[in-house]
Design a protein with these regions (language model features):
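Short helix-to-coil transition segments within interhelical loops
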Residues: 74-79
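Alpha-helix N-cap/helix-start motif at helix boundaries, enriched for small hydrophobics
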Residues: 81-83
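Hydrophobic alpha-helical transmembrane segments of membrane proteins
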Residues: 1-67, 85-223
């Protein structure tokens, strides 16, 4: 635990020193949509934690520079502890980002009377925190697998591929009326609670797989 505490302190110091611009951009985007759009509470509540979930993986790139790994592993830190700390750090930061997003969404509702942030929406936001943890886990796995500039390029490419696949599947379903009706009928037969549980389980599964994969990647790394 001593090694994890030291790594957490390092990453928090690095994040707050390098993340000032990130918070400025997040605040600007949130303010812009609050002033210009009609329905922004949900967007803000999702946008802020999603950006932070992706950004937490950037601490890995700083560890790679100037033989940082060699220095870290000369301390009471091994590869398993290093990966474990990255996931703990991403969990803390993503949870904090989620809380900030919900608070900002609540402020938006107070500022703009036409906004609605009902209990159903809050329940949905509780589910999204698991999704963001899965995103953070995937980000860490990619950054560990692809070092330096490769990691910076692979991550947006992977996101684009996922969106492209989702768009292709959505277009195919929309064009196939029979399949669309079958899917809608199946969804109508499933309650909201079952869908929520399925999303949580799927997110936790993705997070766990990314953790196991990150452990294997780190074990094979050569410095």
């Amino acid at each position: 635990m001593k090694g994890i505490r030291g790594l957490l302190e390092k990453d928090f110091r690095l994040f707050f020193r390098q993340g000032g611009n990130l918070f400025f951009v997040l605040a600007f985007v949130a303010l812009f949509f609050t002033l210009t759009e009609k329905e922004t509470a949900t967007f803000i509540a999702i946008y802020i934690p999603s950006v932070i979930a992706v950004y937490t993986g950037n601490t890995i790139s700083y560890d790679e520079n100037n033989h940082g790994y060699m220095y870290l592993f000369s301390l009471p830190v091994n590869r398993k502890v290093y990966v474990r700390e990255k996931y703990i750090f991403s969990f803390i930061m993503t949870a904090c980002g989620w809380c900030i997003g919900v608070i900002c969404a609540g402020i938006t509702v107070l500022i703009k009377p036409e906004e609605v942030f009902d209990p159903e929406m809050l329940a949905m936001e509780l589910i999204t925190i698991f999704v963001f943890q899965a995103i953070a886990g995937i980000t860490i796995a990619i950054r560990l697998r692809f070092e330096g500039e490769k990691g910076r390029l692979v991550l947006p490419i992977a996101i684009l591929i996922v969106f492209a696949i989702c768009y292709a599947i959505g277009s195919f379903v929309m064009d196939n009326l029979g399949l669309k009706e079958s899917i809608l009928y199946m969804i109508e037969g499933i309650g909201d609670f079952e869908i929520a549980i399925a999303l949580i389980v799927l997110s936790l599964l993705v997070w766990f797989i990314s953790y196991i994969y990150s452990m294997r990647v780190m074990k094979k790394k050569e410095f």
